[in-house]
From Swiss-Prot:
This is Peptide chain release factor 3. InterPro entries: EF-G-like_DII, EFG_III/V, G_TR_CS, P-loop_NTPase, PrfC, RF3_C, RF3_dom_3_sf, RF3_GTP-bd. The gene is prfC. GTP binds at residues 20-27, 88-92, 142-145. It comes from Shigella flexneri. GO terms for cellular component: cytosol. Keywords: Cytoplasm, GTP-binding, Nucleotide-binding, Protein biosynthesis. Increases the formation of ribosomal termination complexes and stimulates activities of RF-1 and RF-2. It binds guanine nucleotides and has strong preference for UGA stop codons. It may interact directly with the ribosome. The stimulation of RF-1 and RF-2 is significantly reduced by GTP and GDP, but not by GMP. Belongs to the TRAFAC class translation factor GTPase superfamily. Classic translation factor GTPase family. PrfC subfamily. One of its GO terms (molecular function) is GTP binding.
Amino acid sequence: MTLSPYLKEVAKRRTFAIISHPDAGKTTITEKVLLFGQAIQTAGTVKGRGSNQHAKSDWMEMEKQRGISITTSVMQFPYHDCLVNLLDTPGHEDFSEDTYRTLTAVDCCLMVIDAAKGVEDRTRKLMEVTRLRDTPILTFMNKLDRDIRDPMELLDEVENELKIGCAPITWPIGCGKLFKGVYHLYKDETYLYQSGKGHTIQEVRIVKGLNNPDLDAAVGEDLAQQLRDELELVKGASNEFDKELFLAGEITPVFFGTALGNFGVDHMLNGLVEWAPAPMPRQTDTRTVEASEDKFTGFVFKIQANMDPKHRDRVAFMRVVSGKYEKGMKLRQVRTAKDVVISDALTFMAGDRSHVEEAYPGDILGLHNHGTIQIGDTFTQGEMMKFTGIPNFAPELFRRIRLKDPLKQKQLLKGLVQLSEEGAVQVFRPISNNDLIVGAVGVLQFDVVVARLKSEYNVEAVYESVNVATARWVECADAKKFEEFKRKNESQLALDGGDNLAYIATSMVNLRLAQERYPDVQFHQTREH
């Protein structure tokens, strides 16, 4: 059976995001991936903060100052005969809910681990989010040009801490100053590393066969023997790669390399295009939508302001789930039941926008938004249904926000509500007083909000500390019991930006007591948009 042109386009799409702890090398890997996809000519190494050559995927002002990627940008590039969409996820010390939500829009994730450190805290958190949908995971052990931990130990740690089996695809030969290259377990080939070639695609020398005397000559007899001994162990102790188990999120293929030295990244990319799934079906509140359907559907997972400092526009990022987008198409925004003509959707190469004539499942479109689109919005060609699984996550950090000029209360509220619809921050208005409490998943979100309130709404605001530990969205099937709960806990209830009722707890103990005292009330950690 030959595939129709539409199905061919769908089959070649791969949409993935990178998850890692800050400084494990995510931005560097992103650059090298783009280099292989010929999307950029030379990789602008991230480190030189003073130089003008900023990494391609870092943009808003604050990012340029701090050398970190705050906004989740989207990059599309060709690789072999696939088209890859890479969604960048903010990775530095401070990230935000955007990072979590971006993971709901991809079909596969690449986990980058600093091989000197192993599994770190942020990696654990992000893996939990991918578990909500059993997303397939590839793993890249990075920084082999430094001294690393024992590779066997690293695999054990991933298996024990992240509860996913490891299937090594390549295996390192030495590390740090002695790093010589990697051996490919399934191709029986050794790829030799040369240092100092990080900015370009290297011509790699390949030695066929594990027992080839050329290998001893190339890496030295000691390392060659050590490799053979280690491989005996590896083959006995680790999982074989199995595509079914990979797609079910039960095992992860593991690649070793150095992103900075641009070595090993292509092995991982080859695995990605060969094994990662083409665009997957998704649930709505009424049925499952398959990527092969001809009617267009998509959902908004993120909204970003000011991608263009010259325009005060906001761009909504939409993941195409099924059907083909064509310029000038009429789509229904399900939440408002209005039909809109979309003639100026964008694709991205971080910061460089270009208008799209067409897009397919797995692609990400940017829609111009003047405050009418919200996170979680579904667009269809008329069918009334809503995609599920795009949550709000309960904030972990809270501040009270106060105006320097009390006459601007109205602008402040407007600004905060718009920023919360965009997912930049969450805002809570306590029922019993006039405070405004801002909740975030990461500290940097607070700085971003104050900066944006000033530049976009001309409001100067400051933060004060507030006695709030966590928030939970509350609901109850029994109206009478709910009224009683609301009456007795008025001082701890607040409305969020979308007017949903939330319980604001001063401590985890306080939350636990409330949950015990009111067993009929449900306290939710996430809320569907």
